[in-house]
Amino acid sequence: MPDSLPPGVRRRVVELASERLGVMAAEKVPPSLRKIARFAPARRAALGATPIAAALETDEAFRDEVVELVRAAFPDVVDALDEGASLPAADPSDVAAIAYLLRSEGWVDRVEQARGVE
């Protein structure tokens, strides 16, 4: 994950990944995250933020797992991002985090928009 993600976006990305990590089948959990996966959710996101962020950047299968959660939890946001639509009522950090995970077209612009409101 680029260090340039705004703090709110990075925090939301890690929260979403942490949530998914807690329910993943053990064999699908990246080796670097197996110990962290056993933590309680809040502790997992707080203490595991750096390795979770690194895994999202380097492990496409793990990011795909997180994207599966995002698609199920935020279908309207995902559809809007897929269509390139504006989301004026949505939290810019949430939108940027979801766009980053999906790597949808224009995700970098969404991150920059979130940076402007933090």
Region spans (language model):
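N-terminal, leucine/charged-rich tether regions that mediate assembly and partner docking
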Residues: 1-111
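Acidic, low-complexity intrinsically disordered segments
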Residues: 110-118
